[in-house]
Swiss-Prot record:
InterPro entries: Ribosomal_uS4, S4_RNA-bd, S4_RNA-bd_sf. One of its GO terms (molecular function) is structural constituent of ribosome. One of its GO terms (biological process) is regulation of cell cycle. This is Small ribosomal subunit protein uS4m.
């Protein structure tokens, strides 16, 4: 195959020509490009014969979008093959899922999961804690667990953090008899959390009762006039076995909870062994991902 590597200025671009040129309206294709169009080339790689008129800055920027590297890549492949173009068989690569990830990727995934668990906690808030406590990972996690919205979720009164923040924003929550309108309000040891008397408190009490007693069992306690007492006793024994499987969320050891009065109090500072997450994070071992804030400033 004939080769000509003379660099010429053709519409202000360097190119290599191989074989005979053929014209199709306003586009040129070499013999090489005609053959390899099906395999390698894309439509954007074709270049026009006539230059475009300068209309503005936008048209000037389009000239730089022509890909020279792709053409060089095609030529280098053809030189190896010796003029014959064919598709090589694609070998399937087996991926070992058991293979351990790199420490950076592992820490970065944990960092993102950790922030999403706290409903996309802002980096600004996260970095302030990092500077305040001088990179001590244990203290940072303890301070995040002392937030009001997090204490409500751990207690079991609330199903999600969205619901907890809604209660706080609508000013239904009291801390030591005062309204707490911010979800990031930090609680100290000995503080008591309670709810305002109103419709919100009644809804929570109804929900907690449903968790323990089923609808069928309530009818038995309300309807006292039973004709068949023996049959009634048999049903009660059967129901007790079913209620054993029903469990209420008691909360961690560092919280004291009363379900009847809807009160929460923080007895001691939270420990890492008592904290649990829905994803695979062991705070006793994998806490070092917080140190990424110091090394990599552009984390999102």
């Amino acid at each position: 195959m004939r080769q000509r590597k003379n660099v010429t200025k053709f519409i202000k671009r360097a190119y290599r020509d191989m074989g005979e040129l053929k014209q199709y309206k306003r586009y040129t294709k070499t013999r090489l490009n005609i053959i390899s169009n099906k395999v390698f080339l894309l439509k954007n790689e074709l270049y026009p014969l006539q230059p475009k008129k300068k209309r503005g800055k936008r048209d000037q920027q389009l000239k730089t979008t022509y890909t020279k590297k792709k053409l060089k890549r095609i030529l280098s492949l053809l030189f190896r093959i010796g003029g014959k173009i064919y598709r090589k068989k694609i070998k399937k690569k087996k991926i070992n899922l058991k293979k351990q990830q790199e420490p950076f990727t592992q820490n970065l995934t944990l960092h993102r999961l950790f922030r999403k668990f706290y409903l996309n906690l802002k980096l600004k808030q996260f970095k302030l804690l990092y500077k305040k406590y001088k990179g001590n990972e244990k203290v940072i996690i303890q301070q995040l667990e002392k937030r009001v919205d997090m204490v409500l979720l751990r207690s079991g009164f609330v199903r999600s953090l969205y619901e907890a923040r809604q209660i706080i924003n609508h000013k239904h929550l009291l801390v030591n008899g005062k309204i707490a309108s911010l979800p990031g309000y930090m609680i100290n040891v000995g503080d008591i959390i309670s709810f305002k008397e109103g419709s919100m408190k009644r809804k929570l009490l109804k929900r907690l009762k449903k968790g323990l007693i089923s609808k069928k069992s309530r009818k038995r306690w309300t309807n006292r006039n039973f004709k068949f007492k023996r049959f009634q006793n048999y049903k009660r024994k059967r129901q007790k076995k079913k209620n054993k499987n029903k469990v209420r969320a008691t909360g961690p050891n560092y919280l004291e909870i009363s379900h009847s009065l809807l009160l929460i109090s923080l007895i001691e500072e939270p420990k890492l062994t008592a904290i649990k997450y829905p994803f695979t994070l062991q705070p006793e071992k994998n806490i070092k991902f917080i140190t990424l804030l110091k090394k990599y400033k552009r984390l999102r």
